[in-house]
């Protein structure tokens, strides 16, 4: 028995949980127009929350596509995991002193760490992720290169967003920063592009 089902769904039925980068949405719009095809997005069949494919989703909304291909899975399955994207920051030499400026309460359920040092914590993981995003944006403007990675040896580590929080915040209409969740599927997910239906 398959762990997923491929369906055509209206983008208006779907619930995003992550924000997007406008330039990537625009790139996706151009690709959809040029190729007339897209890789399916991945959606929880029970809640209609988008798990992967937010930029393609927003591109399809912009183009007014009536239906898009979606791989429908059971998010509650133990075969679906949510992991974190850690960060590598370069150059690394002065980053510890810079992060001390942001050091606040180290009390809280969720914490961001620089190597093994806790930088800040919060009881609300949504607030924690947006604080981290603001710091990353500031670092980028200052000339640092911030790369999100699966590497466990990365410079900055952040806890994964629990599945129930992904669903709850999506239903509240709130979005985590781009590339907050890293979903791992312990079963085959097809990635072939599918010809779009425009009517």
UniProtKB/Swiss-Prot annotation:
Key words of the record: ATP-binding, DNA damage, Kinase, Nucleotide-binding, Transferase
Keyword Nucleotide-binding: yes
One Pfam family linked to the record: ParBc
Entry-linked Gene3D superfamilies: Conserved hypothetical protein from pyrococcus furiosus pfu- 392566-001, domain 2, Conserved hypothetical protein from pyrococcus furiosus pfu- 392566-001, ParB domain
GO molecular function, a single term: ATP binding
Domain of life of the native organism: Archaea
Effects seen without this gene: Cells grow a little slower and form smaller colonies than wild-type, reduced survival after UV treatment. Cells undergo almost no recombination in mating reactions.
Record function comment: Probably part of a 4-gene DNA damage response locus in which the upstream ups system, in combination with this downstream locus, functions in homologous recombination to rescue Sulfolobales from DNA-damaging threats. This protein might function in the DNA transfer machinery.
Family: Belongs to the ParB family.
Record's protein name: ParB-like protein Saci_1498
Organism of derivation: Sulfolobus acidocaldarius (strain ATCC 33909 / DSM 639 / JCM 8929 / NBRC 15157 / NCIMB 11770)
Upper taxonomic lineage: Archaea, Thermoproteota, Thermoprotei, Sulfolobales, Sulfolobaceae
């Amino acid at each position: 028995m398959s762990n997923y089902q491929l369906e055509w769904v209206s983008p208006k039925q779907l619930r995003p949980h992550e924000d997007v980068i406008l330039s990537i949405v625009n790139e996706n719009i151009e690709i959809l127009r040029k190729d007339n095809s897209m890789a399916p997005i991945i959606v929880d069949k029970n809640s209609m929350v988008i798990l992967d494919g937010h930029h393609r989703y927003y591109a399809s909304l912009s183009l007014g596509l009536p239906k898009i291909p979606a791989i429908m899975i059971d998010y509650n399955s133990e075969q679906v995991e949510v992991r974190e994207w850690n960060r590598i920051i370069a150059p690394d030499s002065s980053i510890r002193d810079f992060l001390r400026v942001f050091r606040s309460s180290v009390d809280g359920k969720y914490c961001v760490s620089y190597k093994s040092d806790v930088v800040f914590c919060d009881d609300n993981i949504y607030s924690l992720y947006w604080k981290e995003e603001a710091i990353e944006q500031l670092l980028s403007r200052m000339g640092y290169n911030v790369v999100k990675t699966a590497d466990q040896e990365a410079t900055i580590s952040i806890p994964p967003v629990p599945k129930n929080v992904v669903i709850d915040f999506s239903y509240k209409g709130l979005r985590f920063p781009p590339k907050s969740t890293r979903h791992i599927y312990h079963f085959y997910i097809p990635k072939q592009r599918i010809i779009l239906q425009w009517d």
